[in-house]
């Protein structure tokens, strides 16, 4: 049995199937970890979501920002833009089943036997892993209960941008969601900058990748994440010294779709079909 962590798919179903062929995926013996953003912007979001759901216990998923956008759009809380490719999901016969399944996925997943934790974007440098797990559960429980609509209506926004134990209510939950699904760069004091999406090393000097912040409290935890399609183009790519494993390699943007085998940390990649469009 092997376990593979796969980066952002965003509806690139053909590339996903090519990647599974590349790793000789065996549904009975292997397990797939998906680092969020299963859907949106790519051409086959509905097929992708149906397939991953069909994998059952062979798949572990964490929610990404595009997955949350789909959930919000399904409740008419967020508009669908011209760039979105989720309308086919919302009009599908099994839309409710798919959305309900997605809502029950976690924001953070840990396998203590394998020694890895997976999130979509990152973890606030000020948080311990136990703290991060508790905050993930806090928001996951809301996504799965009757308070979800109010939660989704208040989920969007860039403030507060720095953690404090005194933050309460929707502001607190918004910060938690932004860390798990949107974070890339921080200032030295841990304030989030959610606008900058460049490769590490190309940012202004006042910003630091979240995982490279001095005294990050999860430095001893192996963390898999996606979200950052440009991260491997940075001037520094020695991620292991930070104990992080970024698996988004920009498939949607004509890059690659990548899987890391957790057993030996070997990387497998296939070329994006989007580069041929």
Q: Where do the PLM segments sit?
A:
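Residue-level marker for buried hydrophobic side chains located in beta-strands
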Residues: 5, 34, 61-62, 117, ...
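Active-site-proximal beta-strand elements of phosphoester/diester hydrolases
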Residues: 2-10, 116-122, 246-247
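Active-site environment of divalent metal-dependent phosphoester hydrolases
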Residues: 12-14, 40-42, 66-72, 126, ...
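N-terminal active-site segment of His-dependent metallophosphoesterases
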Residues: 1-55, 68
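Short, basic, glycine/proline-bearing loop/turn elements
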Residues: 31-36, 79-90, 192-199
